[in-house]
Amino acid sequence: MGEMEQLKQEAEQLKKQIADARKACADITLAELVSGLEVVGRVQMRTRRTLRGHLAKIYAMHWATDSKLLVSASQDGKLIVWDTYTTNKVHAIPLRSSWVMTCAYAPSGNFVACGGLDNMCSIYSLKSREGNVKVSRELSAHTGYLSCCRFLDDNNIVTSSGDTTCALWDIETGQQKTVFVGHTGDCMSLAVSPDYKLFISGACDASAKLWDVREGTCRQTFTGHESDINAICFFPNGEAICTGSDDASCRLFDLRADQELTAYSHESIICGITSVAFSLSGRLLFAGYDDFNCNVWDSLKCERVGVLSGHDNRVSCLGVTADGMAVATGSWDSFLKIWN
């Protein structure tokens, strides 16, 4: 038996010991805990607005903290900031590269960012003195595509990349402050904790990792998926995370219990998940799928309680407003829909 084989066996034994130790700490399952709860009634949501203006597939969207404006990025090479109350376009920003994969709205509302196959994160100032929108920074150091970006504040942004790393940037200097190394596959998505001190990443190595922004270290790793993790989000209280994967399941992991609590899947669902988001209370989980639908799950009872159908192509992105009053879905059919 080669040295490599021996080490592999040792690693597997250690993994098993860790799994057993976690199980020993689990005093109750989620199913047992919520056995007395009724399933949420049928969730029926209507399309309240359809945002028309993109001319090609929409790849990403992100709500502003005011729950009114949102930014979307499309293969047509445009970044559009929408007023969702009126469906008007507040800004239509032409991009230098049309191969965009992600976009983000700064918490302050002063900036938006985007990036993709150009390996860069471009920051746009919405509040320039001249009134026009212009590139204020181009952050380039990643050696792979930019899959996701999220602002911490007006001067700090976190990015995830196909080069397997995540990075924290100082926007003012354009430099990487910290590089987060640990994934062994393309990093596909990230989400920032409600207190902005931690972030989570999901990758093609089928694992999710929790990172400490200030320390630059990986605090926890969550495994269980059988394929790429495409989407990830925090539970509203910041104490659990949800992942969506190409294995057709979403999974809920508890940070304090350090393990998976449950999975959301159904034998009739055989396609991958592109996006995930919780309702404000956390009771509902919205998940966008390759089959053109967005399924609504009761996060505690793990049952499907609704479906948002109306798109004519893959639902590529979705998001719930900060005030919890609406959910937006974006699709390869070039439209965004606002539901409640």
From Swiss-Prot:
Q: Which Gene3D superfamilies match?
A: YVTN repeat-like/Quinoprotein amine dehydrogenase
Pfam families referenced in this protein's UniProt entry, alphabetically: WD40_Gbeta
InterPro entries in the record: G-protein_beta_WD-40_rep (IPR020472), Gprotein_B (IPR001632), Guanine_nucleotide-bd_bsu (IPR016346), WD40/YVTN_repeat-like_dom_sf (IPR015943), WD40_repeat_CS (IPR019775), WD40_repeat_dom_sf (IPR036322), WD40_rpt (IPR001680)
Superkingdom assignment: Eukaryota
State how it assembles: G proteins are composed of 3 units, alpha, beta and gamma. Interacts with RASD2.
What species was this sequence derived from?
Answer: Rattus norvegicus (Rat)
In which family does this protein belong, per the annotation?
A: Belongs to the WD repeat G protein beta family.
Q: In which tissues is it expressed?
A: Expressed at a high level in the heart and at a much lower level in the brain.
Q: Which SMART domains match?
A: WD40
Q: List cellular component terms (GO).
A: cell body; cytoplasm; dendrite; heterotrimeric G-protein complex
Each WD repeat occupies one of these ranges, namely 53-83, 95-125, 141-170, 182-212, 224-254, 268-298, 310-340
Q: Which PROSITE patterns match?
A: WD_REPEATS_1, WD_REPEATS_2, WD_REPEATS_REGION
User: What molecular function does GO assign, one term?
Assistant: GTPase binding
Please report the name of this protein according to its UniProt entry. Answer: Guanine nucleotide-binding protein G(I)/G(S)/G(T) subunit beta-3
